[in-house]
Amino acid sequence: MLANIIRIATRQSPLALWQARYVQQCLNHFYPDLHVELVPMVTRGDIILDTPLAKVGGKGLFVKELELALLEGRADIAVHSMKDVPVEFPDGLGLTTICERDDPRDAFVSNRYDSLEQLPEGSCVGTSSLRRQCQLRARRPDLVIRDLRGNVGTRLAKLDNGEYDAIILAVAGLKRLGLEERIRCALSPEESLPAVGQGAIGIECRLDDDRIRQLLAPLNHTDTAARVLAERAMNVRLEGGCQVPIGSYAELEGDTLWLRALVGAPDGSQMIVGERKGSVSDAEKIGVALAEELLAKGASAILQAVYQGQSSS
């Protein structure tokens, strides 16, 4: 293939296309003569919309088709929302670049209420994320939590049609789509701990493709990469997938990395939390150590019950 072309595999949703175009613009900023093509495709997670994500099961619902395009040489890189990226990669592929993180928080979206606290008893809140569900139920057991699938526009339409009193989405996704005005309030990490890698864009490529790796190098954001490394290291040790009730969020304070995490029962009845601080150079070790702490507190029993529920449904 020509040396001045790079092809980006991406999902077809508006948000995924925004992320791919963002990477396209970054590449063109550093390499004005580079021809960057988008290769949109549909993933299994995009097709199965009538089933809660947790029940669809399996890892990599939104990335497998993109990875196949890389392996078959139909694309050179794949752009992912980091919270959708599994902890394991096919042989020959890997995550080489993490772009600068956007706002990692969850957004409270409603047409009638300004905050979670304002919701009356029995209000219906939409989210398919087990992580969001367990934290909502622990905080507000009086609410009715219902699954909500589809792209951002579809979810907002369901809210506007009166199917829900409020929905929970990612702040970053709404901002990227120019829908920031729909955010009634952003939920702090204390209210809703984000997903692993939430708000960050990751780039996957063939590990033996030195040309592509060299082109991607300027797009890597060192601080974001360290934070996401800690969060993902914790997730790897917990053997967590994308559709599990795990929250993890790392912050940097100078050279110190502060990692918080939780594993919760989907019904909100049990919440195991922990935090660790250490040198940013030990990001991966901090993630593993925090996972060990959560496992010692009983996280494995919660996760096992979740996986059994997914396999039997």
Curated annotation (Swiss-Prot):
Entry keyword set: Porphyrin biosynthesis, Transferase
Co-factor binding details: Binds 1 dipyrromethane group covalently.
InterPro entries: HemC, Porphobilin_deaminase_cofac_BS, Porphobilin_deaminase_N, Porphobilinogen_deaminase_C, Porphobilinogen_deaminase_C_sf
Pfam families: Porphobil_deam, Porphobil_deamC
Cofactor(s) recorded in Swiss-Prot or TrEMBL: dipyrromethane
Residues bearing the modification S-(dipyrrolylmethanemethyl)cysteine: 242
Pathway info: Porphyrin-containing compound metabolism; protoporphyrin-IX biosynthesis; coproporphyrinogen-III from 5-aminolevulinate: step 2/4
Keyword Transferase part of the UniProt annotation: yes
Main enzyme class: transferase
MF GO annotations: hydroxymethylbilane synthase activity
Other comment: The porphobilinogen subunits are added to the dipyrromethane group.
Role of this protein: Tetrapolymerization of the monopyrrole PBG into the hydroxymethylbilane pre-uroporphyrinogen in several discrete steps.
Full protein name: Porphobilinogen deaminase
Organism: Pectobacterium atrosepticum (strain SCRI 1043 / ATCC BAA-672) (Erwinia carotovora subsp. atroseptica)
Gene encoding the protein: hemC
